[in-house]
């Protein structure tokens, strides 16, 4: 079927130029669409998914599941890019579950937003650093690479996309002899809201709301 993993074999293909190896290659049209999609992401940032890869469809799922479990229901909700509004009857409050990865333990990659953010940072820096390929290795080149990464990450930090970061030059003489520069970028993704609590308190129409303001 068109939705199977074999569809790409029989679908339309196009011939493109592989600039890195000076050759022509035949690829699926979906790869062209993916490249364009990545270009939009790099230029505009990640858009909000309208309905997810499953078009928002969740079948035979219950709502009594815990974030981070390995159940089929949890996978369906995450795959469909759906957020859940949950009512906790015992505590009498609502909370809004945002999308999470299926990791059981808390980590930097616990939230889908953090994962997409880090992927976007990696793709953007790769595109920016491509301009320095084939330039002579020198102190000026190292400084230019460092400045490019730092300027971009400073923007990410001021925009609250990361909590903090550190950049280290780990290039050795052996690396230089192999025509390589090595840098280590350590970053802490920003915190993403995973639950938003809302308590609905119903009062009489004659209630004096100034009492709440004084609390």
Where on the chain are the PLM-derived regions?
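A glycine- and small-residue-enriched flexible loop/hinge signal that marks low-structured segments
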Residues: 1-136, 145, 152, 157-170
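Surface-exposed ligand/attachment interfaces on beta-rich extracellular proteins
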Residues: 139-141
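Compositionally biased, low-complexity/repeat regions
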Residues: 147, 162-215
